[in-house]
A protein has these predicted regions:
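Short proline/glycine- and polar residue-rich coil/turn motifs
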Residues: 481-488, 500
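Primary recognition of N-terminal secretory signal peptides and signal-anchoring hydrophobic helices
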Residues: 24-183
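Sec-dependent N-terminal signal peptides of Gram-positive bacterial secreted proteins and lipoproteins
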Residues: 6-29
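Short, surface-exposed beta-strand/loop patches at domain edges
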Residues: 511-570
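Exposed aromatic-hydrophobic patches
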Residues: 489-497
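Noncatalytic modules at the cell exterior or secretory-pathway interfaces
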Residues: 498-512
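N-terminal secretory signal peptides that target proteins for export/translocation
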Residues: 1-4
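Catalytic-core signature of thiol
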Residues: 173-446, 451-482, 503, 521-528
């Protein structure tokens, strides 16, 4: 008994001592306690673990180039050796680093022409062929990959400071003036490639291009083949493999969670399609890049995935002759005025690709490296070059930037299966819109999803709890604000989750501002044969110019509002 008491009080004293240590500022040579400094070498290993756990209790704030970065999926960690581990998923958008390779034990990062290779089995990293000693450059914890902050310092020139007092990591890019994009980049070079597909004698290039772009965005972490058949036939539109389509149908299908479905579950050109197959991913964000913004297109390919774009061509899968195509150099450039009629995927670029390789005169060198859906017999095993100066390449551009596991939310509330068909507004760049939904179970509202119909769109999000009629809009509660750089579909995670009671109505309200727009609200309606099956009695949507007087759009406009809610069950 006496020994147990001694052990108990000894444990209490050690814990109290460590807590006191943590309360003082960590110095470079150790932890200061009054006038005494306990060096790292003299600290027991148990202390290091306790200290690390203490730092990780509170979320570590990340500031990069004086801007706070929001971490949604995972937080920064401090390990027992005070290594600062940053979740890998933020590297493309936060640090402009591309993942050329990614698996459970190794990662290849690229920024500009600098390439860094990290491996969990090595006590060093390789930067442009040179080894730099570094313990724990890469770790995996709770199915999340983390990269040591030292990698950013040693490989890409970042300076950083961790404030113990504020629990804050500040990082500064000392190489801001350097171009993040190399002069040439291609998924073929980085081995981030899929097998070339063949649409055959159908008009489904739009679906092949959409899903190929999506598949490359899922890579290099995962390699999966997705069902074109399901996208074409299960998207809410009146559609067959020969009817054609465009990226808006693809976005509607994916953001409605009807797909993407595995190719193994719904094979291409099968006579029937499977409505029961579950999506293998949930698509939460799709960006539409500004027309002819070549640098932003390259950046999207570099950081996220292939960019779906379009061409005009008189060629097809069977007839590959054209005055605009050089069969010997696999180079294409159309300089006429006809609108696009074929979708492809941009998977790279070469700024120095000679203009002499094209069969028509072009302004200068430079070409996108593109992937077609006419089988490996076309071009260079299915790939070809399209001049930067082609009339249509880069006019319509789509990249999938928000791809999450299919268990991210439990429920989706929506009334716009066909997605963004048209737009509403009040001849102004600003408007309010809302959808009202009845909670099926006791749930928490965690996120909302809606379209930005053009670039630089800003928004305010509000919620109305226990909605009954339009008078309930007087009780709107402000949640948060934000801005989108590009047009597209976006999911916004709410900073304040809302508890929802089964059977009660809840309204999400968006105030949107899209510069130079006159109709900034995306809507679904029956615009023709393809959308004739649009259902209006599944939604309760409203619009307002000022937020004071509201109009029920299903009744007055014959349309649905494109505004979704995402919830989790309690």
């Amino acid at each position: 008994m006496r020994n147990k008491k001694i052990f108990f009080w000894r444990t209490v004293c050690i814990i109290a001592f460590v807590v006191v240590l943590i309360s003082f500022k960590t110095q470079s040579e150790g932890i200061a306690l009054g006038s005494i400094t306990v060096s790292e070498d003299d600290r027991p290993a148990q202390w290091q673990n306790i200290i690390a756990k203490e730092f990780n209790i509170d979320r570590i704030k990340l500031i990069v180039d004086n801007k706070e970065i929001q971490l949604n999926k995972a937080d920064i960690l401090i390990d027992e050796n005070k290594n600062i581990m940053i979740p890998a998923y933020i590297f493309p958008d936060t640090f402009n680093c591309a993942f050329n390779a990614f698996d459970d034990t190794s990662v290849t990062l690229q920024k500009g022409n600098i390439i860094a290779i990290l491996d969990t089995n090595n006590s060093y990293i390789t930067v442009d062929g040179q080894s730099i000693t570094m313990d724990k450059a890469l770790v995996k914890k709770n199915d999340m990959t983390y990269i040591n902050a030292l990698v950013l310092k040693e490989a890409f020139g970042y300076q950083y400071n961790w404030s113990v007092t504020d629990n804050k990591l500040e990082m500064i890019n000392n190489k801001k003036s350097e171009n993040i994009l190399p002069h040439r980049y291609s998924y073929r070079d980085t081995k981030r490639m899929l097998s070339i597909k063949n649409q055959g004698n159908t008009s489904s290039c739009w679906a092949f291009a959409s899903l190929t772009a999506l598949e490359t965005s899922i890579m290099p972490a995962q390699n999966t083949e997705l069902s074109v058949n399901n996208m074409v036939c299960n998207n809410g539109y009146v559609n067959t493999l020969n009817d054609g389509g465009d990226y808006t149908r693809a976005i509607a299908y994916l953001t409605a969670w009807r797909g993407p479905v595995s190719e193994a579950d719904d094979i291409y050109c099968d006579s029937i399609y499977d409505v029961s197959s579950n999506p293998v991913k949930h698509i939460q964000e799709v960006q539409i890049i500004e027309s002819k913004n070549l640098e932003e297109i390259k950046k999207a390919v570099f950081l996220h995935g292939g960019v779906e774009s379009s061409l005009y061509t008189s060629m097809n899968e069977h007839d590959r002759s054209s005055i605009y195509y050089n069969n010997e150099t696999y180079a294409y450039c159309y300089n006429g005025t006809k609108k696009p009629n074929h979708d492809i995927v941009i998977i790279g670029w070469d700024d120095n690709y000679p203009k002499s390789n094209f069969s028509v005169d072009t302004e200068a060198d430079g070409a996108f490296i593109c992937m077609n859906s006419w089988g490996s017999g076309f071009g260079d095993e299915g790939f070809f070059y399209v001049s930067y100066y082609d009339t249509n390449i880069g006019v319509h551009n789509v990249v999938y930037t928000g791809i999450e596991d299919a268990n991210n939310y439990d429920n989706i509330y929506q009334s716009d299966i066909c997605g963004w068909v048209g737009q509403l507004g009040y001849e102004s760049d600003t408007a309010f819109f809302s959808n009202v939904y009845t909670a099926s179970e006791n749930e928490t509202l965690q996120a909302v999803g809606f379209y930005a119909t053009d670039k630089n769109t800003s928004y305010d999000i509000y919620v109305v709890e226990n909605f009954s009629d339009v008078s309930s809009f007087e009780q709107i509660k402000y949640i948060q604000s934000g801005e989108f750089k590009n047009a597209g579909y976006y999911t916004v995670n709410l900073k304040q989750e809302i508890d929802m009671e089964a059977g009660k109505k809840y309204a999400v309200v968006i105030k949107i501002k899209t510069p130079d727009a006159v109709h900034p609200i995306a809507i679904e309606y029956a615009a023709g044969k393809a959308t004739k099956n649009v259902i209006l009695d599944d939604g309760e949507g409203y619009i307002s110019y000022t937020g004071n007087s509201w109009e029920h759009v299903e009744e007055s406009k014959g349309c649905n509002i494109c505004l979704k809610m995402y919830t989790k069950n309690m």
